[in-house]
């Protein structure tokens, strides 16, 4: 199993920090193929602090246990590893299957496995609505990572940055009401630009209309996260797509921020 095909991101569960992993490899091979039962179980670990997350040493120990289970369960027929999440001194792991008996029997022989549970999940709600990251979660995680990148380059996040947000629309008539909302609503920006014609870089790409909004903000506080969440919801409201943001400090090296 290739970890490069695991989607990893941070979120929260019941107000506690959580680290999610979703397996995005061969989903089409298993989804809709009769694997309508989900087997869920937990492994306890020693939390590092009040966050409930493991230390680096404890994490390595935990992942070794996870791989021990993966090796055994993925060798069984008609089994798909959906993912897991780490939160509040536990990792909860999810597998889809046609028949749960062999999985349950295998898990019952592993002394550190707890709380084995089997449920029907005909349309994979747990995978698509819980384990898999939403577009907003992906952008928030990218924002966190790229603020760390700025700091690693010696930049002070309390400085004022020129931040450019980008939006795509598949139809021109969707773009203009969106821009009206930005202009008339409570949105702070220095410039607002759009493409007069649809953009299509490659023959196979779907053409789109582009809107770019620039604003000057500090990246020291939560404002950039609030802006990302606000623009994600606004673009969705007008049937567009919020692509993400980049800033002047990294534009020179053509490094997009998400």
Curated annotation (Swiss-Prot):
Pfam family, one: DUF695
InterPro entries to which the protein is assigned, alphabetical: CHP01619, DUF695, RraB-like_sf, RraB_dom
Top-level taxon: Bacteria
Listed name of the protein: Uncharacterized protein HI_0040
Source organism phylogeny: Bacteria, Pseudomonadati, Pseudomonadota, Gammaproteobacteria, Pasteurellales
């Amino acid at each position: 199993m290739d970890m490069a095909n695991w989607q990893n991101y941070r979120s929260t569960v019941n107000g506690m920090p959580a680290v999610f992993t979703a397996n995005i490899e061969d989903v089409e091979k298993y989804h809709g193929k009769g694997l309508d039962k989900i087997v869920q179980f937990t492994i306890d670990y020693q939390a590092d602090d009040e966050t409930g997350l493991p230390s680096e040493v404890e994490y390595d120990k935990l992942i070794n246990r996870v791989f021990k289970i993966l090796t055994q369960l993925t060798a069984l027929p008609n089994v798909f590893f959906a993912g897991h999440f780490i939160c509040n001194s536990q990792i909860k792991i999810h597998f889809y299957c046609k028949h749960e008996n062999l999985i349950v029997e295998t898990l019952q022989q592993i002394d550190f496995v707890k709380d084995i549970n089997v449920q029907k999940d005909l349309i994979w709600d747990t995978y698509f609505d819980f384990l898999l990251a939403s577009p907003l979660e992906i952008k928030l995680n990218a924002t966190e990572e790229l603020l760390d990148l700025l700091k690693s380059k010696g930049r002070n996040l309390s400085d004022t940055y020129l931040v450019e947000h980008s939006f795509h629309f598949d139809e021109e008539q969707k773009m203009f009401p969106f821009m009206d909302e930005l202009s008339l609503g409570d949105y702070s920006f220095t410039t607002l630009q759009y493409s007069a014609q649809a953009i299509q870089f490659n023959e196979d790409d779907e053409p789109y209309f582009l809107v770019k909004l620039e604003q000057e903000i500090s990246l020291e506080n939560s404002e950039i996260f609030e802006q990302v969440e606000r623009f994600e919801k606004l673009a969705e409201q007008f049937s567009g797509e919020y692509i993400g943001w980049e800033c002047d400090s990294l534009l020179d090296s053509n490094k997009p921020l998400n």
